């Protein structure tokens, strides 16, 4: 799968790497996207950090995961763990 956003059943899927798992049932992932700048036509990398709900605390730092958009779970959490694509080495 390609990095960034994808759709499944009208929900957005985000693919990113786990950068923090110090919270209980929550991981922070870094999602990187590439866009072409409208004026300068240069490819620019953008990144965003998302807080993702991990019910079983199964993610570790370095894992590549898919997160799906969901209802608000807390003040900053709006995504759930959908699938672990690749475990950290």
From Swiss-Prot:
The keyword rRNA-binding applies. Transmembrane segments: none annotated. One of its GO terms (biological process) is translation. Keywords: Ribonucleoprotein, Ribosomal protein, RNA-binding, rRNA-binding. The keyword Transcription regulation does not apply. One of its GO terms (cellular component) is cytosolic small ribosomal subunit. One of its GO terms (molecular function) is rRNA binding. CDD domains: Ribosomal_uS17 (cd00364). Pfam families: Ribosomal_S17. PROSITE patterns: RIBOSOMAL_S17. Belongs to the universal ribosomal protein uS17 family. NCBIfam families: PRK05610.1 (NF004123), uS17_bact (TIGR03635). This is Small ribosomal subunit protein uS17. The gene is rpsQ.
